[in-house]
């Protein structure tokens, strides 16, 4: 990061990132991506999960802190597997851990914005924003735009399904316009709702 920062133009921001506690935990337990194997979810013991998540919170904050000290202007927290969490556990496994990390970064680095990406929480996105209070929120392509609460101070980012990059140009531009038109009166960073497909 220090080397990149030195070569980066002054008007360009450097974004650091980290996985959120739940997402790191899924990789640890599953020994890899849970994309095709979610059997591990059946054997989770809530008390043990919370204990590990609390430990990860601390380590992730340190990781983010070191990135900021090395030159990162912004931090993005990726909770890529938040969509696997049952609603009854969402607050303890996703909302509270992200909130704790965001709050600590805000307190110690008030000039460094934080973006959160709780992928897959869909109907619970408004509550996540209200509770966690990030500066920015990345949304995935399954979010119902009409149900988003736009009456808050958060900057929205993303949304477009990457599959449209593989289709014809007309559909791709129409999909892009859908997001640009929806957020036209709101601070918005156009982006995909997840990674680029191969």
Per-region residue spans from a language model:
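Active-site loop segments of alpha/beta catalytic cores
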Residues: 2-198
């Amino acid at each position: 990061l220090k080397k990149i920062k030195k070569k980066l133009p002054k008007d360009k921001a450097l974004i650091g990132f980290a996985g959120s506690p739940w997402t790191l935990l899924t990789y640890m337990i599953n020994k890899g991506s849970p994309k095709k194997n979610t059997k591990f979810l059946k054997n989770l013991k809530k008390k043990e999960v919370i204990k590990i998540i609390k430990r990860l919170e601390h380590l992730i904050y340190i990781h983010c802190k070191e990135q900021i000290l090395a030159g990162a202007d912004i931090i993005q927290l990726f909770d890529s597997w938040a969509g696997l969490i049952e609603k009854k556990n969402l607050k303890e496994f996703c909302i509270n851990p992200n909130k704790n990390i965001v709050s600590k970064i805000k307190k110690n680095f008030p000039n460094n914005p934080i973006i959160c990406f709780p992928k897959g929480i869909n109907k619970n996105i408004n509550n996540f924003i209200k509770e966690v209070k990030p500066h920015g929120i990345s949304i995935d392509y399954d979010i119902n735009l009409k149900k988003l609460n736009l009456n808050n101070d958060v900057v929205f980012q993303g949304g477009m399904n990457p599959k449209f990059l593989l289709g014809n140009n007309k559909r791709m531009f129409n999909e892009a316009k859908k997001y640009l038109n929806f957020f036209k009166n709101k601070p918005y960073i156009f982006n995909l709702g997840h990674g680029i497909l191969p």
